[in-house]
Amino acid sequence: MIKTGRLCLSMEVIFFMAGFVLMGNLPAEAVPLREKAQLTYAPEVPLPIARKKPAIVEVYLDSAVKVMDLGPNVKYQFWTFNGHVPGPFIRVRVGDTLEVHVTNSDESGMPHNVDFHAVTGPGGGATVLTGVAGEEKAAYFKLLHPGLFIYHCAAPPVMDHIANGMYGLILVEPKKGLPPVDREFYVLQSEIYGKEPMEGQEVMEFSHEEGLKEHPRFVVFNGKTGSLTGEGVLKAKTGERVRIYFGNAGPNLISSFHLIGEIFDQVYREGDLLSPPARSVQTTLVPAGGATVVEFGLEVPGSYTLVDHAIFRVEKGAAGFLQAEGKPRHDIYVSKDDPEPCEGCLVHP
């Protein structure tokens, strides 16, 4: 028993002890599972959680500035998590303890942090994860609610950090997991507010003023125009069941998510995985800072288009494609004419 002085513990020891506390009242012989999160980047999704017990799940996020393609002949200086926009998809289980390590590699000196909408507590964790350049912050959070949640940087001014690319999705599976499907995809919508590029200017500059007006220059899926076209097209086969984890980082607009040519068989609105899903939905609203899970079967081969059905946004980049391969279904979809090419059309390839 220590009566005087200080007990100095390493960060590793403190985290190990904290992990035991957050895992609950465990029997003496029980040792909590520990694993490193298998992070993926859009449109890829980590494999479903196979274990049946809670674990301490390590997540490592690095904030850095990176110039990347935004559209044809347009680059943008993004603020990123792990060098990607959107940031990584994190998959955990309700009852898990999230061990988060956040490193600030932004050489500008700007502070960064993470607000997890899945975390219960002040700032969603942001209040204890704020770090300046070269600093690493870490914390433990027990995940009490299943669902699909946004996470984003919340350092001031928070709207600038979100608008510049610091966001991602975290899936907290229910204890019994989710029903199996054949394919899962990660799609996140966001807006880019930029100044009119000057002649010869390759990198578009961010405009806080355009953000205040809510006039985005681009509305995109997965960080850039055309991310789900060409080589980035989502691929599946007829007869398969598809699940899309869809988020809306905003920072301003509501998304009217729609898949041209299909009906969502099930929609877990606003990322709610506890209530029975809505069924046979044509278009679902996804608020800024929110998410949804949609599931559907593919009966007919062909190209299907993901859009924000606030349809003028298609011209700003909010369109992508899912290609379904398989045998024709003339009992469902038939015509004496072949499909005609849609020259200059943004919603049909």
Predicted regions and their residues:
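N-terminal secretory signal peptides that target proteins for export/translocation
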Residues: 1-7
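Copper-binding active sites and cupredoxin-like electron-transfer domains
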Residues: 29-349
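Compositionally biased regions
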Residues: 9-11, 26, 336
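Bacterial Sec-dependent signal peptides at the C-terminal "C-region" and cleavage site
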Residues: 20-32
